[in-house]
Design a protein with these regions (language model features):
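Residue-level hotspots at or immediately adjacent to binding/recognition sites across diverse folds
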Residues: 1-175
Length: 175
C-alpha cells in the first residue's frame, strides 16, 4: 500500500509502493506538513516514520511501531504510539528528536491511543491489558499519563472502560 495524504482533494504519495506503508497522523506547523506513520521496509515489522513535506525520517527500527498521535510546534515534534519492546511486551511510547521514552513501564500490553499537549505538559492515553495468573482474570484498564507519570482518573468502574483519544482545554480561572 502507498502512504499518501490529500491536499485540497489531490492525493500526494509519500511512498512509491515498493513497501507497505501507512499514515496515522498529520499536523501542520509553520506551513510545513508533517505526517507520521509506519512502513514495512523489508517485510518484517513496522518501522516508525515521520514525513516532513514528503521527506521521510525513520524514528524507530523495525520494532512493530504503531503511531496514534502527532504534535509539532516550531519544528519540534512529539510522536505518540506503541512498539514491541525487546522483551516482547507492547509498550506505549513518545518519540522526540531526543529519542524514545517508554511511558508504560511494567505493563505487558499497553497500546497508546491519544496525545495532547498543553503548554509544556504532555498527556498520553492508553489501553492496557494484563492477566491475574492466580485467578486467570483478564484485567483491562485505560491509563492516562501526564509527563510520563500515570494520573488517577475518577471513574465509576475502573475495569470496564477504554480511552480512544485525548484532548486538553485551557480554563482561565483568573478574572
Amino acid at each position: 500500500a502507498i502512504a499518501c495524504i490529500w491536499k485540497n482533494g489531490v492525493a500526494q504519495n509519500l511512498t512509491d509502493g515498493s513497501t507497505l506503508a501507512k499514515v496515522n497522523a498529520i499536523c501542520i506547523d509553520g506551513g510545513v506538513l508533517y505526517a507520521a506513520g509506519a512502513e514495512k521496509v523489508s517485510g518484517g515489522r513496522w518501522k516508525g516514520v515521520l514525513w516532513k513535506d514528503g521527506q521521510p525520517t525513520y524514528f524507530t527500527e523495525e520494532v512493530g511501531t504503531e503511531v496514534t498521535g502527532l504534535y509539532v510546534k516550531e519544528g519540534k515534534y512529539i510522536i505518540e504510539g506503541n512498539m514491541t519492546a525487546d522483551s516482547g511486551d507492547i509498550v506505549t511510547c513518545i518519540w522526540t528528536e531526543e529519542g524514545v521514552q517508554v511511558i508504560s513501564e511494567g505493563m505487558a500490553l499497553c497500546q497508546g491511543t491519544g496525545l495532547a499537549v498543553a503548554g509544556s505538559d504532555i498527556y498520553v492515553a492508553g489501553n492496557a491489558y494484563d492477566m491475574d495468573y492466580g485467578t486467570y482474570e483478564e484485567i483491562y484498564r485505560s491509563p492516562v499519563w501526564k509527563n510520563g507519570t500515570e494520573m488517577a482518573l475518577e471513574v465509576v468502574s475502573s475495569d470496564n472502560f477504554t480511552v480512544w483519544g485525548l484532548a486538553c482545554a485551557f480554563v482561565d480561572t483568573q478574572e
